[in-house]
């Protein structure tokens, strides 16, 4: 029996929500280990539609949900989300939701700085959601973050707020934005502290006990490898590491506890916001993929850019992300296309290359080298076994496996939870 870690392998929005929900029904504990409330997904359970950004997906299946120390927590957003799902019938208590006491908080000053800096960038925006994720991670690394455990120590909180405001107010004033007083932040924290503190605990200790007891743990990643602050399309990335190794450091478990790493990838590629996108399609095919795939951001509502499957990027994600197998989603969106292209390499300044460059200028200059395959006219929507798939769709999946150097262990053929073909059980690996 193994634990399972789920990560995205593209630029997010790969359909992690459905896959995590599908796996969560077989797990005992579901853990968020990085990111904040800047990414979200939609889960459908019976006649209820849940939109989650911070809460672990397992809560909708009656499992224990964990927010690890690697997550930056906006307490206001968290309480709003808890109130919303509670009104829908979910039970969210300190027994069902554990939050790491050493998780850093996102305060109103972080969002204000995030938005002020993005506005000041003019034509060089990086596409931040303006929710304070980046500034909160900056504070963590600079050792001035307010952590949940600080709320229980008024004296500690007092001097840490002084240090935090000295930094942030200097930046805000320099950007011509409104500054904050200590009283404003104290009032904000005083309001949420009674609700937040009961959920806080030593998550690392509880997870270690669960592991020793043989309980199945599902680690739920946010964003994706190509948005990783080190390995993604920097600076058009998120502010945290998103690879599977962070499941350990972001929740306080040993590296060996990460288990089977399931990378999620769409059968094509999408991206929200700014940044390089070698296989982006600006034609009718791109628009068709967006319309069929309902490609709009869960959190931002922004339309996603669409393009062909990029095997070069996924192969990189497999290697740096530690991916054991791929869950390929939205295969049905490709139904009916005459031809389907896969990016198998790039051209950069007239030379062929087999890996994606790190320099921003080179990333924007690469041109995709495509391999084209015939499409299929039959439908794959709702298929639940290989026997139900068109022969050409199977060839497409097999070619992807060859190019990314990893097996497709799970195939999703519609947004419905049970429209899933399982080739290999990650929990039994």
From Swiss-Prot:
Annotated EC: 6.3.4.4
Positions annotated to bind IMP: 13-16, 38-41, 129, 143, 223, 238, 302
Catalytic site: 13 (proton acceptor), 41 (proton donor)
Pfam families for the chain: Adenylsucc_synt
Catalytic activity reported: IMP + L-aspartate + GTP = N(6)-(1,2-dicarboxyethyl)-AMP + GDP + phosphate + 2 H(+)
Nucleotide-binding found in the keyword field: yes
Pathway the protein takes part in: Purine metabolism; AMP biosynthesis via de novo pathway; AMP from IMP: step 1/2
Cited function: Plays an important role in the de novo pathway of purine nucleotide biosynthesis. Catalyzes the first committed step in the biosynthesis of AMP from IMP.
Protein name per its UniProtKB record: Adenylosuccinate synthetase
The species this protein was found in: Gluconobacter oxydans (strain 621H)
């Amino acid at each position: 029996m193994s634990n399972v870690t789920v990560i995205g392998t593209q630029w997010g929005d790969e359909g992690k929500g459905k896959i995590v929900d599908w796996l969560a029904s077989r797990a005992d504990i579901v853990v968020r280990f990085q990111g904040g409330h800047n990414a979200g997904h939609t889960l459908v359970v019976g006649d209820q539609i849940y939109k989650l950004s911070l809460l672990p997906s397992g809560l909708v299946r009656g499992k224990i949900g964990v927010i690890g120390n690697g997550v930056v927590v906006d307490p206001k957003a968290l309480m709003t989300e808890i109130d919303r799902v509670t009104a829908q019938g979910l039970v969210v208590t300190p027994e069902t939701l554990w939050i790491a006491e050493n998780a850093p908080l996102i305060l109103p000053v972080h969002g204000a700085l995030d938005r002020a800096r993005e506005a000041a960038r003019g034509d060089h925006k990086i596409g931040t959601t303006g929710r304070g994720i980046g500034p909160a991670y900056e504070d963590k690394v600079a050792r001035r973050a307010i952590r949940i455990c600080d709320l229980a120590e008024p004296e500690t909180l007092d001097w840490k707020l002084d240090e935090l405001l000295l930094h942030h107010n200097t930046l805000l004033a320099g950007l011509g934005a409104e500054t904050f007083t200590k009283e404003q932040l104290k009032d904000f924290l005083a309001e949420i502290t009674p609700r937040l503190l009961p959920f806080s605990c030593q998550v690392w200790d509880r997870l270690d006990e669960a592991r020793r007891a043989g309980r199945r743990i599902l680690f739920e990643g946010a964003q994706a490898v190509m948005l990783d602050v080190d390995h993604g399309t920097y600076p058009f990335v998120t502010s945290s590491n998103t690879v599977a190794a962070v499941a350990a450091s972001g929740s306080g478990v040993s590296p060996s506890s990460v288990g089977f790493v399931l990378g999620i990838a769409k059968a094509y590629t999408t991206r929200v916001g700014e940044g390089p996108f070698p296989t982006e399609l600006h034609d009718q095919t791109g628009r068709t993929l967006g319309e069929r795939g309902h490609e709009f951001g869960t959190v931002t509502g922004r339309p996603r850019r669409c393009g062909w499957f990029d095997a070069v990027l996924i192969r990189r994600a497999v290697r740096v992300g530690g991916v054991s197998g791929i869950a390929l989603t939205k295969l049905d969106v490709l139904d009916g296309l005459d031809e389907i292209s896969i990016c198998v390499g790039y051209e950069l300044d007239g030379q062929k290359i087999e890996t994606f460059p790190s320099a921003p200028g080179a990333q924007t200059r690469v041109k995709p080298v495509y391999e084209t395959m015939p499409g299929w006219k039959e439908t794959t929507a709702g298929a639940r076994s290989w026997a139900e798939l068109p022969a050409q769709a199977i060839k497409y999946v097999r070619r992807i496996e060859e190019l990314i150097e990893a097996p497709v262990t799970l195939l999703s053929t519609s947004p419905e939870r049970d429209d899933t073909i399982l080739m290999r059980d990650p929990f039994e690996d």
